[in-house]
């Protein structure tokens, strides 16, 4: 079985380096890494890094895409470039727990489902009680925001399965769905600081 790690990136210069280094180290030999770069809004630094890394390692594919403000369109374009039996979509500012990477093939081979929801550990440096109340968030003792925050991320590479919604996108066209256990070891990590969180919220508000 072949798995496609499918990544979207805009201006997350440090984060895309962290993610690619982890994936290149931990992925199975038959798996592929596919990166879709927002060439309309992205940074020169990210594009230069992708070009440089692609020449040096040749272990991932990357493609430019002029983002039109519609996240489902972005992810459907990303899917077109994937050749794996399953796709694991990851944003550039996220990264998977090593245990999840070590076990993902076994999980997929023993669970014949179209879509698997993945838990996510969100942390926001600088988060205050005022922010929590303003956004209606729940934060546990570990400081994780809205855990398990299930994400639509692992799905069969099938023509019938597609993304929809301009923001808060989700998958449609599947027959069966399941979720990973709500455990840190099987989660995506999503760390950010409060400044980036506020900018992201403002940006999403312009798209709704």
Predicted regions and their residues:
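Conserved acidic residues
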Residues: 3, 31, 60, 85, ...
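Catalytic-site signature of metal-activated, phosphate-bearing donor transferases
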Residues: 71-79, 86, 95-208
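A short acidic, amphipathic alpha-helical/loop segment
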Residues: 18-22, 49, 77, 102-104
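Acidic donor-binding segment of Leloir-type glycosyltransferases
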Residues: 20-64
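Solvent-exposed polar/charged
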Residues: 25, 80-81
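N-proximal low-complexity "stem/linker" segments adjacent to membrane-targeting elements
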Residues: 1-25
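Chalcogenol-based redox active-site neighborhoods
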Residues: 68
């Amino acid at each position: 079985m072949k798995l496609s790690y499918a990544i979207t990136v805009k201006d997350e210069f440090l984060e895309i380096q962290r993610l690619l280094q982890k994936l290149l180290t931990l992925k199975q030999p038959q798996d592929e890494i596919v990166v879709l770069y927002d060439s309309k809004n992205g940074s020169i630094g990210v594009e230069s890094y992708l070009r440089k890394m692609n020449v040096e390692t040749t272990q991932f594919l990357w493609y430019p895409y002029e983002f039109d403000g519609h996240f489902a369109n972005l992810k459907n374009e990303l899917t077109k470039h994937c050749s794996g039996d399953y796709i694991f979509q990851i944003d550039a500012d996220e990264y998977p727990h090593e245990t999840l990477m070590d076990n993902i093939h076994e999980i997929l081979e023993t669970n014949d489902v179209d879509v698997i929801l993945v838990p996510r550990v969100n942390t926001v440096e600088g988060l205050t009680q005022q922010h929590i109340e303003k956004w209606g968030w729940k934060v546990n003792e570990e400081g994780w925001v809205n855990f398990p925050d299930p994400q639509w991320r692992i799905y069969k590479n099938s023509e019938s399965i597609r993304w929809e919604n301009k923001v808060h996108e989700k998958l449609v066209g599947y027959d069966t769905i399941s979720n990973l256990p709500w455990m840190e070891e099987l989660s995506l990590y999503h760390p950010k600081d409060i400044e980036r969180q506020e900018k992201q919220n403002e940006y999403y508000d312009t798209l709704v």
